Structures are given as structure tokens and as C-alpha cells.
Amino acid sequence: MIMYDQVGCGKSSLPEDPGVYVKETWAEELVALRKFLHLDELHMLGQSWGGMLEMYYLTSFDPQGIKSVMIDGSPASIKLWVQEQHRLIKYLSYEDRAAIAEAERTGDFTNVKYLAANDRYMEKYCWDDPDENSPEPLRRPTNGKRASLIAEGPNEFTENGTISDFDVTDQLHKIHVPVLVTSGTDDLCTPLIAKSVVDHIPGAKWHLFANSRHLALLDQHDEFIHVLDQWLAAND
């Protein structure tokens, strides 16, 4: 199993040049990684942005040797993602909705009321703030916030970065490898978002994790590992 930190995060380099943080960079990085490690055949699993990168890679680079793909909690369209995030915001308290609306209106994402509202939003649909009982990877220092800010934007519902126009929905028909889409019932990646991916990939399958937010691997760990094991065994 190979896991890697993309350029701009983790232990990889953190370039100052904002022009680096575009989808093309990360796709070319994946191409280079496969070549360097001689990964002629492989299974791929991408979570959130990782799944978006998979879709872009598969539809734009015509890669060979892909035995199967798992797309976990990822949109094919940022426009649909933003629409769904604003729908999810409606389930927050009036005070939190107002704080988020004011931040989006003014462009000020430093206000303490907004920050608290966004924290509650992420806890509801993504994952809790890490504590001493959280899995070790979540307790590591976070490197790469600048890359996320440049590529995505200040949060999940104000997408104004370099990938704000990301939309490969009409290209998904080009994918002709086994694909499993996964998502949670209480996920930032709503069932509508996940279904929009499944419906456009020939033969794609979908597993919906009950009572799971954006990190199904953590919310439904045993079920997630079981689904992954079965998927790999069926396509290896």
C-alpha cells in the first residue's frame, strides 16, 4: 500500500508560488509517482479531493493499468457541492446560519462567530476536532493550509479557489474501469452528490454508510474496511 502527501501538504514541499496549487500539478504529480515507483498496475482510493483527482486523472490522462478505483466522498462538480453545502447549512441554528451568511456577504472569515459556526458545521458533517483519543494521523500538526486556501477557498461552501470551476461530470462516461463510490448519510458529500457521480460512470457501484459523516473510515471503521477488502478482492 502506498500513501503520499501531495505537494503543498504534510511532509511534502510547501511552495510559495500560488500557481502551483492547481489540479494539473497534482495530476502530473500522480503520473510522476507511478512512473518513479513502476506502478504498472494498481488499485486507487481517493478521499474527498483525492477522489476528485482520480476522476480528473481518469478522464484527462487515459491511464492504463488501473485495476479498480474507489471514490470516497467526492464531487464531480464543485457547483453542485456548493449548492448542497448551502442546503446543509439550513440545518444549523439561526445564529450559526446568520454568522455564515454575514461572513460570505462581507468576505470576512475571521469573525469569532463565523469561526464557531463553521466549527459546528464541520463537526456535524465532517469530523470532530481532534483530541488525545483521536487516531494518530488526525493529531499531527497540519501543514498545507495555504494550499487548501488557494485551491479551494476559506471553507466548504465558499469555493473561490483554483478548483472552483472543477466539473468533470460530462467526462465521466470515459471511465471504463471498476469504480466504487462511497459516502455517508450525514456527509458533506451528500447522497445527491454521490449519486451524480455514480449515474455518470458506466457500471459504477455505490455504498452508502449509515450514520456517517465525511470520514466514513472513522465513523464506520469496521464496515469501511470490510467494504474495501471485498472490493479489492473482487477486482484483483
Language model: regions and residue ranges:
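Short beta-strand/loop motif that positions the catalytic acidic residue
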Residues: 175, 181-183
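Conserved hydrolase catalytic core segment
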Residues: 40-84
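Conserved alpha/beta-hydrolase catalytic His-Asp/Glu region
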Residues: 104-162, 171
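Active-site loop signature of alpha/beta-hydrolase-fold enzymes
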Residues: 9-12, 77, 215
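Flexible "cap/lid" loop of the alpha/beta hydrolase fold
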Residues: 67-108
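Conserved alpha/beta-hydrolase "acid-adjacent" motif
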Residues: 188-193
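Active-site loop/oxyanion-hole signature of alpha/beta-hydrolase fold enzymes
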Residues: 2-49, 53, 62, 226
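Catalytic active-site module of serine/aspartate enzymes centered on a nucleophile-bearing elbow/loop
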Residues: 203-236
